[in-house]
A protein has these predicted regions:
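N-terminally biased helix-coil "hinge/interface" segments that flank
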Residues: 2-234
């Protein structure tokens, strides 16, 4: 879980699930083998708002890193998941390098009250809890999507939670899904970068042939495979 989204994937016997077809933004299909990751708009900067029906929504819009959540003190004007965690005492102001802690906390309370609490007739702490509950439900559904939908039981897995915001939500997700154990790395915000450094390098070669099976030319197929082999070892 980062600033704009949460990415979820299933790892079975130390092997991540791989999909031959994945959708990226705007539902664009990509027919390239890649790790099967489901992405939802629930990150630390995801904006909480009241929709036209008068219901509380969280994401997919994000405040980004600039100005970012209100609690960053950079002029953010929209309540976010991070602001909810901040008001509930789950974020250390010192770790955010907040110099005017009291003023920023009052700004966060004021904006949350005007944008959310008054409209829902709740106090700020109830609103913050509601924001986190909606975010956690979205993340729990994403975990169900990569596990239950493919015949796996999340109760038989452990939850490995990382990203700058992930560990703050891990225990609630584990309780919701009856996941027995939660693992949090020493530096969760750096885990993605570390993964890029230590992961095995892999290359996949694919080519589309728009011909019927009856028209398939074995020699042509062999020539394509030989080219793949040549490209792979070069």
């Amino acid at each position: 879980m980062g600033g704009t989204s949460t990415d979820v994937s299933l790892v079975v016997n130390n092997k991540p699930a791989v999909s031959s077809e994945t959708e990226i933004e705007y539902s664009m299909p990509v027919h390239v083998p890649m790790v099967d990751v489901r992405t939802i708009g629930a990150g630390g900067g995801s904006i909480a708002k009241i929709n036209e029906a008068g219901l509380l929504e969280v994401g997919p819009e994000s405040s980004g890193s600039d100005p970012g959540p209100i609690c960053y003190g950079n002029g953010g004007k929209n309540p976010t998941i991070s602001d909810a965690n901040f008001l509930l005492g789950r974020l250390n102001p010192e770790s955010l390098n907040i110099k005017e802690n009291i003023k920023i906390k009052e700004d966060t309370k004021s904006i949350l009250e005007n944008e959310i609490s008054k409209k829902l007739k709740l106090n700020n702490y109830q609103s913050a809890e509601a924001i986190l509950k909606i975010a956690n439900n979205k993340m729990a559904n994403a975990i169900r999507m990569v596990s239950i939908s493919v015949g796996e039981d999340p109760r038989e897995f452990n939850l490995f939670s990382f990203g700058g915001a992930g560990p703050m939500h891990a225990c609630e997700l584990a309780r919701e899904l009856d996941i027995p154990k939660v693992f949090i790395p020493a530096r969760p915000g750096l885990t993605n970068a570390l993964g890029c450094l230590v992961a095995d390098l892999r290359q996949d070669f694919t080519q589309t042939l728009n011909i019927s099976l009856e028209e398939t030319n074995i020699k042509k197929l062999h020539s394509i495979l030989e080219k793949f082999k040549s490209d792979g070892v070069s």
